[in-house]
């Protein structure tokens, strides 16, 4: 069993995989050192981070990862292996020589002694309009020039010191576009350059704890007043317009003799003379379906005589819309209903039954003219 034991890998064999942690040959170590650090060094091995003597003299950030300044223990696979950069997170000094270009995401690498210094490096939670209002409100005469506003922002908020072009343009745009800031020309006896900017007294209520409301309060007041005026107008116009809207409906309801133009809910019940017409129509339809042939002439219902001749011709059988009938009292054979018949022979217009009240349709089911009932298959 001992013949199968493999020897441990030698350090030179690991050099291609881990060239930056001190396992490369001397010539490779010198190559990396000369590439990243042009200055000459006496030996390839330097003191570790704990000494701290040569860290501040090399501002190159590549030194942390590829340079020989960090000499951690060799990388050995196993549960007790040392981390790749064990001492980089224990440094008690800034890792970069200058902190002027750091953003908010890099603040975790810096030793911040107090919260005041931290607030100097982050953006203040105020809009540009609020900054302008604070600057003007803090002035003795309640007015400032553009350069004085710049100076106030830069002195009180060091965050804006690193880049002046962007926020200064925003200050100018807010002064020009916001109605709360008024331009006041200089007096003739006042030497200097540029006009003064003041704050409109009506806009002081638009600032809540230094934050500008962006005209929300004023717009809401205007919208509420306009809405109340519109409501008053509609209320005043309702008594005048309501009779006009109800009169045409009354005229339509009264003009329809049989309730043909109005809805079934508003129609009065039809006269009882319509029932014999419907019974005669249904009896003739039953006789036609049970005894007639599909090739016979179309069905004509002479029972619908109260209508004029032209109306009777329209209501007899228009063959436009399909509204079949079932549950006929005289129907006895279900096999005749299953016979294929032309739809234009059995279908009829919905205007025939529109003359009658809906309670007549309770005994009329229109699902069996072309389709057989259940249990009547031949």
Curated annotation (Swiss-Prot):
Tissue distribution: Expressed in kidney.
InterPro entries the UniProt entry points to: Fork_head_dom (IPR001766), FOX_domain-containing (IPR050211), TF_fork_head_CS_1 (IPR018122), TF_fork_head_CS_2 (IPR030456), WH-like_DNA-bd_sf (IPR036388), WH_DNA-bd_sf (IPR036390)
DNA-binding region, residue range(s): 123-217
PROSITE patterns: FORK_HEAD_1, FORK_HEAD_2, FORK_HEAD_3
Keyword annotations of the record: Activator, DNA-binding, Nucleus, Transcription, Transcription regulation
Any one GO CC term of the record: nucleus
One family name in Pfam for this protein: Forkhead
Subcellular location: Nucleus
Top-rank taxon: Eukaryota
GO biological process, one term: cell differentiation
Entry GO MF terms: DNA binding, bending; DNA-binding transcription activator activity, RNA polymerase II-specific; DNA-binding transcription factor activity; DNA-binding transcription factor activity, RNA polymerase II-specific; RNA polymerase II cis-regulatory region sequence-specific DNA binding; sequence-specific DNA binding; sequence-specific double-stranded DNA binding; transcription cis-regulatory region binding
Composition bias, Polar residues: 236-248
Region entry Disordered, spans: 1-26, 208-278
Listed PANTHER family: FORKHEAD BOX PROTEIN, FORKHEAD BOX PROTEIN I1
Task of the protein: Transcriptional activator required for the development of normal hearing, sense of balance and kidney function. Required for the expression of SLC26A4/PDS, JAG1 and COCH in a subset of epithelial cells and the development of the endolymphatic system in the inner ear. Also required for the expression of SLC4A1/AE1, SLC4A9/AE4, ATP6V1B1 and the differentiation of intercalated cells in the epithelium of distal renal tubules.
Protein's recorded name: Forkhead box protein I1
Gene transcribed to yield this protein: FOXI1
């Amino acid at each position: 069993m001992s013949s199968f034991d493999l020897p441990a890998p030698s350090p030179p064999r690991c050099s291609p995989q881990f060239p930056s942690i001190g396992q490369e040959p001397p010539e490779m170590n010198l190559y990396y050192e000369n590439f990243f650090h042009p200055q000459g060094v006496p030996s390839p091995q330097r003191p570790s981070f704990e000494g701290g003597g040569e860290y501040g003299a090399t501002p190159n950030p590549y030194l942390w990862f590829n340079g020989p300044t960090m000499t951690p223990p060799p990388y050995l696979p196993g549960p007790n292996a040392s981390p790749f950069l064990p001492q980089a997170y224990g440094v008690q000094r800034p890792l970069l020589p200058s902190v002027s270009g750091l953003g908010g995401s890099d603040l975790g690498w810096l030793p911040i002694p107090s919260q005041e210094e931290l607030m100097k490096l982050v953006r203040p939670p105020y809009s540009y309009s609020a900054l302008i209002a604070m600057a003007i409100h803090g002035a003795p005469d309640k007015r400032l020039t553009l350069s004085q506003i710049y100076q106030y922002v830069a002195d009180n908020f060091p965050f804006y010191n690193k880049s002046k072009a962007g926020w200064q343009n925003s200050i100018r745009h807010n002064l020009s576009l916001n109605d709360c800031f008024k331009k006041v020309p200089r007096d003739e006896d006042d030497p200097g350059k540029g006009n003064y900017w003041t704050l409109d007294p009506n806009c002081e209520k638009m600032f809540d704890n230094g934050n500008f409301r962006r005209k929300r309060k004023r717009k809401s007041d205007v919208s509420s007043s306009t809405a109340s005026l519109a409501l008053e107008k509609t209320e005043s116009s309702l008594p005048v317009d309501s009779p006009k809207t109800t009169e045409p409906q009354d005229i339509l309801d009264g003009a329809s003799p049989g309730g043909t133009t109005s809805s079934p809910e508003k129609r009065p019940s039809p006269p009882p003379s319509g029932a014999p017409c419907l019974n005669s129509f249904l009896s003739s339809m039953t006789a036609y379906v049970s005894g007639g042939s599909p090739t016979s002439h179309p069905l004509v219902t002479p029972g619908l005589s109260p209508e004029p001749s032209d109306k009777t011709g329209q209501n007899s059988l228009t063959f436009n819309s399909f509204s079949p009938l079932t549950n006929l009292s005289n129907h006895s054979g279900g096999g005749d209903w299953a016979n294929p018949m032309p739809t234009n022979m059995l279908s009829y217009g919905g205007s025939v039954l529109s003359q009658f009240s809906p309670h007549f349709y309770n005994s009329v089911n229109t699902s069996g003219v072309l389709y057989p009932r259940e249990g009547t298959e031949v």
